[in-house]
Amino acid sequence: MKSEIKKNDMVKVIAGDDKGKVAKVLAVLPKTSQVVVEGCKVVKKAIKPTDDNPKGGFIKKEKPMHISNVKKA
């Protein structure tokens, strides 16, 4: 599906928990028709302990949302 939304565009979320937010697009996933929007649909992800991070823990990360849930601002 061809989309006018590109990386670094400012978009407004029109559906979902973050409805009304205006933020920047971090990534566009054309195969799945999804976008990753900065600060929207944030989830806590568990990180296993590694050599770099011996304690492990949690990080907050944006999940992709369907492109129909955003429009250019």
Curated annotation (Swiss-Prot):
The keyword Ribonucleoprotein applies. SUPFAM superfamilies: Translation proteins SH3-like domain. The keyword RNA-binding applies. Keywords: Ribonucleoprotein, Ribosomal protein, RNA-binding, rRNA-binding. GO terms for molecular function: rRNA binding; structural constituent of ribosome. Residues 53-73 are annotated as: Disordered. Residues 53-65 have a biased composition (Basic and acidic residues). GO terms for cellular component: ribonucleoprotein complex; ribosome. SMART domains: KOW (SM00739). It holds the Pfam family ribosomal_L24. One of its GO terms (biological process) is translation. One of two assembly initiator proteins, it binds directly to the 5'-end of the 23S rRNA, where it nucleates assembly of the 50S subunit. PANTHER family: MITOCHONDRIAL RIBOSOMAL PROTEIN L24 (PTHR12903). Belongs to the universal ribosomal protein uL24 family. Part of the 50S ribosomal subunit. This is Large ribosomal subunit protein uL24. The gene is rplX.
